[in-house]
Amino acid sequence: MRKIALFLSLCVFIWASDLQQALEYEKQGDYKKAMEIYKKLALKNSSVLISQEQNNSSQATQTQNSITIKKEEKQDFSRLALANYLGENESFNPLGISSYKMNYFLPFAYSFNSLGVNNNKSEAKFQLSVKKRLFENLLGLDEKYYIAYTQTSWWQIYEHSSPFRETNYQPEFFIDLPLYLKDYEFFNNLRVGILHESNGKGDENLQSRSWNRIYVSTAILYNKFLFVPRLWYRIPENKKDDDNPAILHYMGNFDVNLAYLGDDYFINLMLRNNLKFHNNKGAIQVDLGYDIFNNGIYWYLQYFNGYGESLIDYNKHLQRLSTGFL
């Protein structure tokens, strides 16, 4: 800015000197030389005006580009939310590990039902979920092979010793097969996997919980609506080794997720049911996320009502409201 002011001052000084000289020529009657100086001044003035106009145009273009970049960044956050929801966030990292399911920390998780003796109804809940691609296209179908790990914990942080009340571990292997259906482009993929889930407690105090499933799921995307149905088959166990023989009665054989994905927010509804008219059991979960500061960190609200939020409580009805961020 100082350079521009100095340049303009110099131009004004030069123009004033030239103008004074032209006036002197006029007084002497030499109009030809006076007109030549006037022409030079006019050309200098027009070049400065053109330069100023170009500068203003350049600034306007930069401003417009800045606005466009900001809009594109906002759109990128929307695509990031969708990729994270589908488990397709392949951000570069040396180990090739990326996010799988939602990763969140909810420091305020309140249960409207008892969590057992000596347990506080208020606790924290968090989930870590990652995956790694092993290889791809072995069958020539553009399929991808993954291993994944998800850990969900319920943490009694408001108690004196802050013990972990329950932790569920879910290692799995799955294959993603892209679907290229000309008339059904909203079908994105077909996923087939095997999933183990346990709470790692062994047999002490009859609190051990575990089961194994084979599942198939798909993702159906229409505009900003995402529908993800999943069906599973429980791999049978010996009655003597089965920690939770009635788990299918409470968890059923399927769940569905229906989500709306906005530019800076999402709403998701999860439904699960055993489809029994007599002694019906199931669960509903509502998730709401909002990117408050437009930086990819979402404020997150979660409501759960039903059975099977955790393995230790799979046969207990719980209603819980939790909030935090993801």
Predicted regions and their residues:
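Outer-membrane beta-barrel "beta-signal"
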Residues: 317-326
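Cleavable N-terminal export/targeting peptides
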Residues: 1-79
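Glycine/small-residue-rich hydrophobic helix-like segments
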Residues: 266-292, 297
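Gly/Thr-rich phosphate-binding loop signature of adenosyl cofactor/nucleotide-binding cores
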Residues: 126
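Conserved, mostly hydrophobic/aromatic
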Residues: 130, 301
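N-terminal regions that are enriched for targeting/export leaders
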Residues: 52-112
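Outer-membrane pore/translocation modules
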Residues: 25, 96-121, 135-263, 271-273, ...
